[in-house]
UniProtKB/Swiss-Prot annotation:
It is found in: Cell inner membrane. It comes from the Bacteria. Its main location: membrane. GO terms for cellular component: cytoplasmic side of plasma membrane. Keywords: Cell inner membrane, Cell membrane, Membrane. It is a peripheral membrane protein. Belongs to the Syd family. InterPro entries: Syd, Syd_sf. It holds the Pfam family Syd. This is Protein Syd. It comes from Shigella flexneri.
Length: 181
């Protein structure tokens, strides 16, 4: 496990939860995750769940993705997706508004790995360098990804070579995120 990335993710999650507490006097609330089982759920309303991050359980790697492509995935990606269970968190990096993706449960972790595999299949078909997404943007065809060759974090337009480097590594990127509520 990459300790710098794990700590940066935990620190951002704490900043996010603290900001939520400050503004709403509660743990984060999600309507999107209502009805989806998770160890993160503290309580449920008629149409939403309150959640708090929980330690990840299970194998702490994305080896299914590695096996599918017979490649080695950046250690920071293993760490990013296996440090904790949590709800997705809205954030800002500079002037970029994003939703930081998280695994909600062990079932969700399997789904995330399947989506990462699908993403890599498309990139391979289009002969694009491999990236692994970590966040979504309002523009559907743009994501924040980690380049699997360099470990750099970039803003990427899906299906194209258009990439803008944002940070030299994932820990640096996470440390610069500001919570958005």
């Amino acid at each position: 496990m990459d300790d710098l990335t794990a700590q940066a993710l935990k620190d951002f999650t704490a900043r996010y939860c603290d900001a939520w507490h400050e503004e709403h006097k509660s743990w984060p609330l999600s309507e999107e995750l209502y009805g989806v089982p998770s160890p993160c759920i503290i309580s449920t309303t008629e149409d939403a769940v309150y959640w708090q991050p929980q330690p990840f359980t299970g194998e702490q790697n994305v080896n299914a993705v590695e096996r599918a492509f017979d490649i080695v995935i950046q250690p920071t990606i293993h760490t990013f997706y296996t440090t904790q269970f949590a709800g997705d968190m809205h954030a800002q990096f500079g002037d970029i508004k994003l939703t930081l993706l998280q695994t909600w449960s062990e079932d969700d972790f399997r789904r995330v790995q399947e989506n990462l595999i699908g993403h890599l299949v498309t990139q391979k078909r289009l002969k694009l360098p491999p990236t692994l997404f970590i966040a979504t943007l309002e523009e559907e065809l743009e994501v924040i990804s980690v380049c699997n060759l360099s470990g750099e974090v970039c803003k990427e337009t899906l299906g194209t070579r258009k990439r803008t480097n944002l940070a030299s590594n994932l820990a640096e990127f996470l440390n610069q995120l500001k919570p958005l509520l």
